[in-house]
Amino acid sequence: MPRRKQQAPKRAAGYAQEEQLKEEEEIKEEEEEEEDSGSVAQLQGSNDPGTDEELETGAEQKGCFSYQNSPGSHLSNQDAENESLLSDASDQVSDIKSVCSRDASDKKASVHPKLPTEAHSCMDKMTAVYANILSDSYWSGLGLGFKLSSSERRHCDTRNGSSKTDFDWHQDALSKSLQQNLPPRSVSKPSLFSSVQLYRQSSKMCGTVFTGASRFRCRQCSAAYDTLVELTVHMNETGHYQDDNRKKDKLRPTSYSKPRKRAFQDMDKEDAQKVLKCMFCGDSFDSLQDLSVHMIKTKHYQKVPLKEPVPTISSKMVTPAKKRVFDVNRPCSPDSTTGSFADPFPAPKNASLQLSSNNRYGYQNGASYTWQFEACKSQILKCMECGSSHDTLQQLTTHMMVTGHFLKVTSSASKKGKQLVLDPLAVEKMQSLSDAPSSDSLAPKPSSNSASDCTASTTELKRESKKEKPEELRTDEKVLKSEDYEDPLQKPLDPAMKYQYLREEDLEDGSKGGGDILKSLENTVTTAINKAQNGAPSWSAYPSIHAAYQLSEGTKPSLPMGSQVLQIRPNLANKLRPIAPKWKVMPLVSVPTSLAPYTQVKKEPEDKEEVAKECGQESPHEEASSFSHSEGDSFPKSEPPAESKKAEPCPLREEDKRMKDGGEKEKAQPVEPVSSLSNGCALAAHAPAPPCVNPLSALQSVLNNHLGKATEPLRSPSCSSPSSSTMAMFHKSSLGVMDKPVLSPASTRPASVSRRYLFENNDQPIDLTKSKSKKAESSQAQSCTSPPQKHALSDIADMVKVLPKATTPKPAASSRVPPVKLEMDVRRFEDVSSEVSTLHKRKGRQSNWNPQHLLILQAQFASSLFQTSEGKYLLSDLGPQERMQISKFTGLSMTTISHWLANVKYQLRKTGGTKFLKNMDKGHPIFYCSDCASQFRTPSTYISHLESHLGFQMKDMTRMAVEQQSQVEQEISRVSSAQRSPETIAGEEDTDSKFKCKLCCRTFVSKHAVKLHLSKTHSKSPEHHAQFVTDVDEE
């Protein structure tokens, strides 16, 4: 066939995008197209009889062929399903076949309207060949699908404007049909690119992902392709790719003595190679095309993490029946055509899912992963803690952040080293902290389905902890939770499922335990204080901070709220031990009062009525009234518990003994309200001597001591029930009702006040004893309070700072130390060291600087500047003597002073100025007073001005530091003499401490630790260390 050199045919609308390309490339591509189509036509002409003969003789062999080796292999899934729906009856096939052949010839005529006569004759020959092929009965199904898809594809091409000049449908089809002459490959081992070819045109249904100028071009022959898949096929067939980048890069020297542009190009290439790296073998590539060919050639895409579409979650979370349905509906990998062709009915069900997968991905990666991911994403994007499915990764991330499930999953996995999905400790911890109290509050309503479900799941959880079968029961519970949904594939499409932890209904009925920030803070602080008190080892120097993210070993998280919060030290007095079994058997009814303040925190004060309704299920009049009264009268209501304790001590003691005896039996039985309430009061009426072991109460007591508010040690009655006090503390702090210490002793409370409020609702037709005990419990919850919320976090931060293992004041110790000594104890642990003055206590990095300290530092810095002969001032460093003087006088550590100096120097070098000093880079500084904003030109005048603010001269600072030192040492000797009596207690705490610092009486495990302490804290040089260290045993 003669070659056309310069004459280009007029393009149809579908080719409008190509006009942006250069003229030479168009001509070159068209020449290649002519050569290819000519050679193909000649091949076809020579092979026509053979092809027909083969079709008639080898029909059985081709009937069993996979679609991937047939001319229909470029069909997308949707095309294939349409085809399978249309090709049911043979008469229907024959009717549509004639129509389609006419349509196809019309299309050909309309697409190439101005072709020369040679091309027309060539196309006529090919039309005759195809008519002959398609008339054969064995080809009816495939022929129909082929002709339909070609016409549809032409429609889509003209609509999207995304076809290319060097692609011709009949040439492509011919090359596919010529493949039938090759020896047939086995269906079980498909060709390397079968899945790629199967999806070849699917992206054109919904438009290409890469539109506009970002066409995929082969870098060696400049052939342009619409999709990366087509370019990858081309590169694999022609070998136009590089697979040895890593070896080349090692040999190539990296020299940048090139022109600037070349050097930047090489840098870009290196950056690309850092990104375009095979995740399996680590080879890096210059281009995305090379990487994709490498992945498909080596099958490394199968070994990349997350390749498997259905994780192990599905086998554990889905019931067998649902799993069978899911397996039937889930299409197999695109290589095998049975998944979508065998059954035409799943097509409408999964249509939206598959369409979205086309829109988002377009099968650009050439593998089956994306498609299977879309089909199975309800199983993949599933919270490993609670099993909820999500549509997108973003939704799953939001869910885990809001509910805090990421913390529980990761912490439990790192702790236990188990499979993440079903870690029972994390599951139980989450359930006991959120689900258990909430669902318990709904338990008395058997009429509502949600309440019964929750009750079932809660009892299941309790049974789980006792029978040691967490895996099976957890699976049952997951099944129970997922019973409501018809099919796992439908889950992400259900709008109510996406935000199941944020809906108002769930917050109201409390069945899901929503994501509450205060609750998570409370859990964190609780665990932190537990770990600090127990002295459990941790992996860094800050046990109380990091311990918040560990699961305590002694905790049984699946028990109700009280037992989770309650952490009892084994070395406590014997009389304290019965508290644990009591709270293990605290029945379902007593929890709603503890829940009331908690839900109040969640929903803010406007929802008081809802909360009262919610927790009033068991005895509506009584509980609602008690809660509303406790809300309205929260000021005076902090007193009554003591009176209730005095009113009925004897029966409660008897109840105590009964509880000890029958604790184990009652675990499995729900207890009546009356006994449960008296159980609740049994804690309140416990002997006044032992301390409260509730961690948050301990936190409150140490907070009060730390802030100087407390004069008395914390006694047990002030915070009776762990569950109620835990919630009430944060409830009260959020409302900011009162800022007075909770430690006022029981004896000072007037009896009249408490009686007035105890019998306030005696007009109600209920038992007064029950009312009294209920009242005591609810007001008990109110009595355990904290300062307003704005101070709470900073106080907790300060509290955590002073909780290292060796220096934590334990509750057991504090109960035996008189109040004055306890206060001294806390001050000793926190502040009293030789360099700290009583006026200026160190607060740590978060606090603002003491202005006097800043003035001293600025004056010393200004005095260190020296003047050159030219009159310019230059920076110099403060010597160790000056730093020591500042440290001794201000109480700042040497490290803090060095950091301040380094920061000032850095700012001066970088910007030429800092807050109190400008124009330093020009050599003529201007000094600013931070107190009165005056300006000075010379250091001497600036220093004298600062001295006027300070009230003393800098040269007197040494003398004042010595006087201050003697004062502090006197105070230390006084404190240490006062501490002689509880020395035995300190010995109990610091069993492994062997050495002691003479200056501040702190004990250390090794001599090295004492020397470090002397250097850092007291600024003592190493030669003097020996005289300040003593052995604890010698004393």
Swiss-Prot record:
Residue ranges: DNA binding: 842-912
Protein modification: Sumoylated.
Stretches with biased composition (Acidic residues): 21-37
Per UniProt, location of the Glycyl lysine isopeptide (Lys-Gly) (interchain with G-Cter in SUMO2) cross-link in this chain: K189, K307, K316, K418, K462, K481, K498, K602, K801, K821
InterPro entries attached to this UniProt entry: HD, Teashirt_fam, Znf_C2H2_type
Primary site of residence: nucleus
Keywords noted in UniProt: Coiled coil, Developmental protein, DNA-binding, Homeobox, Isopeptide bond, Metal-binding, Nucleus, Phosphoprotein, Repeat, Repressor, Transcription, Transcription regulation, Ubl conjugation, Zinc, Zinc-finger
Annotated region (Disordered), positions in chain: 1-92, 240-266, 432-496, 600-674, 764-791, 968-987, 1015-1035
GO molecular function: DNA binding; DNA-binding transcription factor activity, RNA polymerase II-specific; zinc ion binding
Gene Ontology terms: cellular component: nucleus
SMART domains given in the database record: HOX (SM00389), ZnF_C2H2 (SM00355)
Biased composition (Low complexity): 432-450, 968-977
UniProt modified residues of type Phosphoserine: S981
Compositional bias annotation for Basic and acidic residues: 460-483, 601-669
Subunit structure: Interacts (via homeobox domain) with APBB1 (via PID domain 1).
Function field: Probable transcriptional regulator involved in developmental processes. May act as a transcriptional repressor (Potential).
Protein name per UniProt: Teashirt homolog 2
Species assigned in the record: Sus scrofa (Pig)
Gene: TSHZ2
